[in-house]
């Protein structure tokens, strides 16, 4: 089974994906590294630009039929069996991205993307099997246990559990300040 771990930058994708792969005894695949290795990604400043169709081709050709956890904020656009969309409180995302040295504009873009469910909506448009997991106030180990429990119980779709509209008024001034 190919499992995509996706979400807005700062939700904990890499940590959760590595732990989940280890727990399930699956291969861990960083989409950035995979794209660079296959020649369908290139470094531009601090980021990797990816040709999505080419990356999907290589995923299909080299990983289909294998057990792997794909880590990356584009993983929900790949040919996978299950998409896990990780979510986190927008302010928490802003704090994490500030700690990583993101500039104000990038922080604002990502906090807003989380606030309006951007990645979740894309995942639902691309796939039937989508599970949404709120990582706020949970350890990575607890998030992995929740994912494994959902997989083992046969749940293939669970969306709509996160609603940031309740914190919208609190987040808008935060966005104007660039996450400060």
From Swiss-Prot:
UniProt cross-references to HAMAP family, sorted A to Z: Adenylate_kinase_AK6
Protein name: Putative adenylate kinase
Organism whose genome encodes this protein: Pyrococcus horikoshii (strain ATCC 700860 / DSM 12428 / JCM 9974 / NBRC 100139 / OT-3)
GO biological process terms, semicolon-separated: ribosomal small subunit biogenesis; rRNA processing
The family this protein is said to belong to: Belongs to the adenylate kinase family. AK6 subfamily.
Stretch list, region NMP: 30-50
Function: Broad-specificity nucleoside monophosphate (NMP) kinase that catalyzes the reversible transfer of the terminal phosphate group between nucleoside triphosphates and monophosphates. Also has ATPase activity. Involved in the late maturation steps of the 30S ribosomal particles, specifically 16S rRNA maturation. While NMP activity is not required for ribosome maturation, ATPase activity is. Associates transiently with small ribosomal subunit protein uS11. ATP hydrolysis breaks the interaction with uS11.
Known catalytic reactions: AMP + ATP = 2 ADP; ATP + H2O = ADP + phosphate + H(+)
Subunit structure: Interacts with uS11. Not a structural component of 40S pre-ribosomes, but transiently interacts with them by binding to uS11.
Top-rank lineage group of the source organism: Archaea
Binding site for ATP: 10, 12-15, 100, 138
